[in-house]
Swiss-Prot record:
Keywords: Activator, ATP-binding, DNA-binding, Helicase, Hydrolase, Nucleotide-binding, Transcription, Transcription regulation. This is RNA polymerase-associated protein RapA. The gene is rapA. Residues 491-655 form the Helicase C-terminal domain. GO terms for molecular function: ATP binding; DNA binding; helicase activity; hydrolase activity, acting on acid anhydrides. It comes from the Bacteria. Belongs to the SNF2/RAD54 helicase family. RapA subfamily. A motif (DEAH box) lies at residues 278-281. Transcription regulator that activates transcription by stimulating RNA polymerase (RNAP) recycling in case of stress conditions such as supercoiled DNA or high salt concentrations. Probably acts by releasing the RNAP, when it is trapped or immobilized on tightly supercoiled DNA. Does not activate transcription on linear DNA. Probably not involved in DNA repair. Interacts with the RNAP. Has a higher affinity for the core RNAP than for the holoenzyme. Its ATPase activity is stimulated by binding to RNAP.
Amino acid sequence: MPFALGQRWISDTESELGLGTVVQVEGRMVTVLFPATGENRMFSRAEAPLTRVIYNPGDSVESHEGWSLAVSELTEKDGIVIYHGIHSETGEQVTLRETLLNHNIRFNKPQDRLFAGQIDRLDRFGVRYQCQMLRHKLASSDLLGLQGPRVGLIPHQMWIAHEVGRRYAPRVLLADEVGLGKTIEAGLIIHQQLLTGRAERILIIVPDTLRHQWLVEMLRRFNLRFSVFDEDRCVEAYADHDNPFYTEQLVICSLELLRKKKRLDQALDADWDLLVVDEAHHLEWTEEAPSRAYQVVEALSEVIPGVLLLTATPDQLGHESHFARLRLLDPDRFYDYDAFLAEEDSYKDVAIAAEALAGNAKLPDAAINSLTELLGEKDISPSIRLIQADGIDAEVQQAARSELLQELLDRHGTGRVLYRNSRASVKGFPKRFFNAYPHAMPDQYQTAARVSGMMGGHKSLEAKAAQALSPEKLYQEFEDNSASWWKFDPRVDWLIEFLKSHRSKKVLIIASQAETALSLEEALRTREGIQATVFHEGMSIIERDKAGAYFAQEEGGAQALICSEIGSEGRNFQFASHLVLFDLPLNPDLLEQRIGRLDRIGQKNDIQIHLPYLEDTAQERLMQWYHQGLNAFELTCPSGHVLYSEFAEDLLNVLVVDDSDELTNLLNHTQSRYKELKHAMEQGRDKLLEINSHGGEKAMAIVQRLAQNDGDTHLIGSVIRLWDIIGVDQEDKGENSIILRPSEHMMFPTYPGLPEDGVTVTFDRDTALSRDDIALITQEHPLVQTGLDLITGSETGTTSVAILKNKALPAGTLFLELIYMADASAPKSSQLYRYLPPTPIRVLLDKNGNDLSAKVDYASFDKQLSAVNRHIGGKLVTASQPILHPLFAKGEEYAQVVVDEMVAQAREKMTQQLSAELSRLESLKAVNPNIREEELEYLRNQMQELNTYLDASQLQLDAIRMVLVSHV
């Protein structure tokens, strides 16, 4: 294409960007600036999806200064079109270079296509209209970002995501107990921030071992393609940019990478919108000597607007460590540890009052006095009277309690920055039952242990303990690779018999090492032909998906899945309820992580935990410490990390040297300390914080709405019809799933997101949750979003001609159906769509210019129409031109009235909502310092910007259908 600086073009795929200007032509690339949104796009000159904008004599064009020009002729100089004509205000003869055209101009192209005989198939008009309706529905939903992820509809998770995800630059601490889904909550918030345009560039910092887990979670659950950055990736990226972090929008990296000054400086300079830090409780801090890791995160949190910290519960951490996390979120607010402790102490009255309000009994005098004092600036006596009175409707009393609770929440010290759910406050967890199976130590292992002891060597206590816990590994070290420990290990014999006696059950088996997992699979296959599959860190994501799918399959699937420690990270198998621990990890957190593969919200059965172990060995002693000391098999142990830190040396000594007195002593001390910590945690429970974190009835209402949307048959029909029109092959696979594949006859050369070898999808959430290899299709899924964009961003369905066979109407009667779009060019981050979503406006005109759309609905009208071929359609349009021209003008008049009303309503809604929120936050700031000034300033600026964008809103003709009555 011939490009010149200053020329005006429009994007064929992103028409909402408005009129673009060529700002750079270099080599094979052209750069176009779209001033309406402030965005740049770079295209290949040979294949740019752009259309040159040149007006014709008779057209009216608008300058960037706001005046119009009636075009009489046009000339060209150096590739730039110059329009000549009459100034709309002065009546003078003037010229206007195309470079100075108004960039908010919209292009009503369908008439040009119609009169040029470019007529689409009838069904494409319908699909285009449906696509615009779907875009409107999604953009106007206050649940945008929550429907699409492949996650269970868990109330507390959806509540936190709904509350935090819609904030500007959220800065919060997610501190739920293990198993309650902090990663999912963070993913939901990230997904919501991206879909709503509040964030575009996101950096996730995780421990080295969790990088792959996060990559998988973000892709499989949230359809977000993050890139993992390590030193090698940074070096490779230099070919594209001086700062490697600018080469991707969504990045996962480890703290280790950012400890290097060069990489940290680059990350600090990379203009992120949101920072997410997992395992934030490992960031060590004291006022005198913060750790390097803490300093890295602190530096990033000072320059990145939004921050999510995922951490252990505050009760696990201790107050000082908890304060250190809060300090990262808001150093101005949490500036002094002693002041923080004093403030925490003052919250006890708030918690006591909240406890009373959360119950159903009448309020004691002490609670009423506390409430009156805490909410001193508000008259709460009417609410108190309702709660205390007899014979009052229960719903009315509950509403009064809820109102006062909300007032308390708004004033709670960390209520806006800390979310912490516990198993005590969240229902729906199964019970856990522990089953142990002792076996005699094989002679081969005893011999290997003796030889190892004689050989000596300088090994750390931890290395000796690890060796004692895995005798099969020690044995293999002294034998050649052909030796097979599984041929004599009694735990393997037990496992085979267990699987044979539980043929109908799915069994998850976890071992520490990938080599152990592979050997177990070989043993099951060669000795008994038991169907099992393996899951370890040496496999690719696709291989793991296939293994997980094979295990999940009810008919013909694997009975057992054998995982290594690292390989099982980030994968959950709630459809299984039997867990075999072939060995035990040294760390209580890893043990909980193993059990957590099954013990999650959504598990429908009680969990049976099975441990085959070798008697009188380190395996038995570690089992006793976990079971008798921590009760870690049958209950979650939030204090496990603390207890292991305190007793690690004693435990390692007991594992390495068999001393029954030392073991008894260790178990007694551990039990005693465990009870102390548990009691302290129970005493420290913050009822108000729990209420705020799980959302109560509001959370349930969100989940109910999402569940109703899941069963939307209209959406399913529309999406399948969309794929039909585009030309995607669809094969019914059974089990509520469809295989989608690109076909040779697709309407578009590529369908971004649709793999060449196809993808299996389902509209059923339960099916998607049980199968990692099946994508959950909702309106938010990229395959749906891309499909909508392909249709609405192209000319597909913009013109159509149809025949209406109806003898009640005179033959030759003409109707003109016009679909307009009320839209405005604005960056996604402005949130304009919340008030003025892209809205299709339907006008149905008879030949006299009367609008019949209110009397004749779209669906019933559409069913009566028959298609005509393109050639005949073109002739009918040509013959009808004298009637059509005035109808277009009339249709625009009708639609403009609707748009003006919509803009007025949008302005009123925006002003009411944002003013109310601003007023609320301003008044709260006086009593709760957690209200950040940045949030208030953002709301003020947003109101100004939105008014500007609403002023620039325009009407765009999107599609035309001409209908003629025939009796033939």
